[in-house]
Amino acid sequence: MRERYDMADNLPNILVIMSDEHGPMFSGTYGHPIVETPSMDRLADEGTTFENGYCNSPLCTPSRLSFMTGKYVSHCQGWDNSTPLDVGRITWPWLLKTKGYDTVLNGKMHMMGPRPLNGFDMQ
């Protein structure tokens, strides 16, 4: 993959942190009086934070399907945690790859089906 790094050197880094069952109020960035999160605080200070997030489904997989595709859950046809992402769906990692990014997934996404990485180069 080294040949791609030269092209990507001028691209800004994009880091998306999506935690499961973690409210922002439990981090120093959002003012918790006791919990200390210095690494997250530094990332927030040097990057972008979002004050008005929206969770499109109370279930893990439908919410992730929507997040990965930018579509409503009803458009992804993901109603439960066993729904695979349709092979024909374009995800934002696929789009980033077309712009020269290397994409890595760290953690779980519960994406089942024939394309479990759904655009990520590696996990």
Regions found by a protein language model. Give the residues of each.
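Formylglycine-dependent sulfatase
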Residues: 1-123
